[in-house]
Amino acid sequence: MRLYDTHCHFERADPTEIAAVLARAKAAGVEKLMAVGGSPALNEAAALAAEVAAEALVAPKVCCAVGFDREQINKHGDTETQRHDVDNALCLRASGLKNSLAAWGEIGLDYHYSPETRTAQLELFGRQLEEARRRDLPVAIHTREADEDTLGLLREIPSRGVIHCYTGTPGMARRFLDLGFFISISGIVTFRAADNVRASALVVPDDRILIETDSPFLAPVPHRGRANEPALIRHTCEFLAELRGVSADAFAEQTFANAERILG
């Protein structure tokens, strides 16, 4: 079984810790993973994960994504000068990644905690969609309680990529699929109350579904409540395979091939 974790985070830029996580992932059948940024610290840790994997004897192949998520507005401000500084810092980080940079992210909109920052979030999201398009990179998109605005901006700035950790309705999933996006399902699908996620997972075509951990968050059952990591993606794979009526090996291979098409 070959597994591809299309979205995970490393919260600390600790080479020893990262190497241990990667070794456990490799032992669990993870052949590739994408380490995802979203803040200066996460971007650095994602870049380090790619470096550690390249030098390790036992590790999956690691690509990475860098970006600034919506939370950075509160941390870094939204004046013209601050926006310029953020964009420059991000582009400098991306330029140093060379062959390991596979996507721009995570980026997107989240109105759950800070709906008052909607305008600033849209502006930041739009700038990064433009940068990803300039670099010919797919995007890793977070959307929470903001799907209509997310769709609107993706229509305005045509992009390709992944709607990560999808938790929306089946109908909304179809609308993202109509724009050409892949839908990535996390361990949330194994949670007892996640009927909506399971329903959505069933409408995604075989050639557009991906799996992810979003680690260190959202550990799947039977590990819910502990820190998540890429090695645990096997549980999500097996759960979704049973849900969709296919073998775990076949589903792992399908999602691996899908991920390679969009992320490499």
Predicted regions and their residues:
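Mid-domain alpha/beta scaffold segments of enzyme catalytic cores
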Residues: 1-264
